[in-house]
Amino acid sequence: MLLRLKGNYIWPAMWKSFVPRPGNIFFTDDPGNMQLADDYGIVVSTSHHEPMQRATNEWNETLKGPWDWERNKGNVTQFMEEGVQRAGKNETYFTLGMRGEGDGPIQADDPVVILEDVFKTQREILAKYHGNESAANRTSLCGILEDEDANTGLLEVWTIYKEVMTYYAAGLLPPDDVTLMFTDDNWGNIQRLPLANETERSGGIGVRLSSGFLAVAAPSPDVLVDLGDN
């Protein structure tokens, strides 16, 4: 279906389904899913709440403590690293950052300091398995960037969702080669669109608009097309 819609980028659904625990997990329901997507030219990423190619449903089954960077950094780091290992050399858009337990805000005195450490650790993991490929983040994904001279390196994205925008406004910024993904709130409300200086980043920018059953008032597909054209 994605190819028929002329798309080549997917975030597998993060929510639990009605199938038995742990629910649908793109990466493990069929271990060949990632390779099949790569064979068809589909770039696999994960939602704003699921960094480094790991699914929320996977963490829920680990029994390795809370999803909390301050209290459980070792286990969370190991979980993320296993996602990078599993992705291998398949074309992947690695999600950076993290939110708190249950896709809520990080519960800490200074989330910005925590996320700075998260970024640092995630970049170290990516460098461990991909070397200097993470030094550039340009691609012809969706036909947006097609400069033949552009260095096509590892793809990384940080999604600026809900309270994360306040961290960004406070000065939190990932490396320049990381794509900034601006997004709505599931209900079609977006805080703002990228500015000119943001579009000049080597990692580029993106905009995510929701269309799904979680928020029934989300924009219809035809509205999304009009917004994309504009």
What residues fall within each predicted segment?
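Feature activates predominantly on carbohydrate-active enzymes
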Residues: M1-P66, G88, V157-Y161, L172-G188, ...
